[in-house]
């Protein structure tokens, strides 16, 4: 029913820009908002990436009426479909951090869900390799951290053991993480989405949350059809075509989450963390009939990421990446519509070869082809230590019924079901 309501609203709203210009001239914005079509809803989830879908499913399973709003034509077009598709064990993150807790819990939930719902996945294990003497102590730190986080089966291997396990590998020592794995992210999202819809959740695509305000009956969410925002760029500010009045709003918009939160006009922007964006390219291994590796191969973590690593997909295709390219502040249109530059610069491959050959010396010149790129939403910039996930409720920003998720980078995929569980328990009763 609500989907039909939104469709009728879009059909009535062909002159949004002109009405907004007139409103500005008349200084009558509040009156125009009062005349705007309104719809009372229970829960609104902003963003249909893997975290947003998992949150929608969890809320729907608990009997809540859920509307998911996604600016793109379909689900999972952003960070969720542009990552390594790795199920992480939980050994990189400081003990008791949200990343550590949600990764370890999420990994167990994810393996169980995939097994029970036929989602393609494989627990293939990971080797984190020390290729220089200075790396060996870092392996010990990761071992201690992972053990404290409750990661099972971790052990340090001598180089000859690791190279016997992976003949193409070169290293001095390695940390084996047997509980790491891979998953078909699209199939996972499709399964979670189907279950959410089966329990009453509604997914509305090509629809953008452009802001909100606080009224006596709670937070009001401003919504517009995505194509009208593109048409308004340069001509006038976007104007809401529909106002939603929800009991609960969960901002899972990924790269766009901080920008949307700032548009809510109800939050002190000082509580919204500064955002940084790390673009990363992947290159695929060509001219090979079989994978040179059977496990995930990771170097010691680097500034901004986990290093250029070896990832396998479920068809045994090999990809290397991502690298780290810090990009500037996102532009106006990209922030609203989640439209970003995902092109792969072919010349970046020259930096890949020496990085990969540190642990895979037999990599041949010309064997890497451009794959895809992704952008990671970060809360710490170049040269800074990684920052934990941020999940803000009323206790932080003072707005009842609003939950903001910031900096949901890796291990966001692994953590998705645990994050959803946490939000449903803490904020949905």
What are these regions (language model features)?
Residues 95-105, 132-138, 176-194, 204, ...:
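Short beta-strand to alpha-helix junction loop
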Residues 19-40:
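A short, basic/flexible loop-to-alpha-helix module at the beginning of a structural domain
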Residues 35-51:
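Beta1/beta-strand and adjacent pyrophosphate-binding region of the FAD-binding site
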Residues 85-161, 165, 171, 307-308:
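Dinucleotide-binding Rossmann-like beta1-alpha1 core, especially the glycine-rich loop
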Residues 175-247:
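Helical element adjacent to the flavin cofactor pocket in flavoenzyme catalytic cores
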Residues 2-4, 8, 33-38, 385-429:
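C-terminal lid/capping helical subdomain adjacent to the catalytic/cofactor pocket in oxidative enzymes
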